[in-house]
Amino acid sequence: MLFFTAPSMKIFALFWLVLLLSTSLAASAQEYKEYRVRFPAATGQKLALDMRGSSVVVEAYEGDELIIKGNGYEATPERAQGLRPLGQSPAADNTHLGLAATLTGNTVRVQQVSPKRVTYTLRVPRRAALVYTETTWNGGELRVTDLLNTVELTLKNTNATLTNVTGPVVANSVSGSITVRFAALAAAPTAISQISGSIDISLLPATKATLALRTMSGEITTDFGLAQPSPGASQLGGRSVAGPLNGGGPRLSLHTLSGNIFVRKTK
């Protein structure tokens, strides 16, 4: 028969209390690790993201739902349930991931309401359009893969990497790098502009495009056989290049005030 002294009984009770609390918290964290919303129609799908300081991965797939996962998000403590921190977005966190998601027509808008830095992964239908807005200067990383529709980016200092996209891509940024690897070039114009930072574009070797490239204090480099600029224009390694690629095609405009522009063949 085991006998416990009063101090040991207190320690034993405390141990079980901690264990129960840990189990409860773990279950709570697992309960809301994923959020889903279905797009009502197969065409005209759009995802609008308003993010603040977090890193975001957008992955396209063959499906009709938006699936969101948050890595590193800590749920609101029980004592704070129903309360909202001052200075936080007035939108309500209805995903339990620090995000507010609303469906209007065939557009899902996701707004980050929590100021905490989290890594979010969003799976979105492959033919959905993406509109991404960075709302603060906290800076994160943005990665987009396999989307076959318009990508619109309004960035402050996030580094953005787009892989296996068709666009068109319309991006404006203050600082940070923008890297795009095109699977093909859409017929609509693509335009990327920066104040400070590099623009790195990869195209299939046979891509037809009409280029307009300009940098104020950087260089333009390429491994494509671009025709030399007309007399009086800057040389290829200089500040401005305009002309056809492989005979011409959709307009591809790349502008940066302070940074380099790279136009390379997809390997």
Short names for language-model regions:
Residues 1-15:
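Positively charged n-region of N-terminal signal peptides that target proteins for export
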Residues 13-24:
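Bacterial N-terminal signal peptides
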Residues 27-50, 55-137, 143-148, 152-154, ...:
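Acidic (Asp/Glu) and glycine-rich low-complexity loops/linkers
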Residues 73, 140-142, 158, 176, ...:
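Hydrophobic lipid-interacting interfaces of membrane-associated proteins
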Residues 130-133, 141-142, 178-180, 200-202, ...:
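Beta-strand-rich extracellular passenger or scaffold domains
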Residues 159, 163, 168, 177, ...:
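Tandem repeat domain/solenoid detector
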Residues 161-163, 169-173, 181-193, 207:
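Short helix-loop boundary/capping segments
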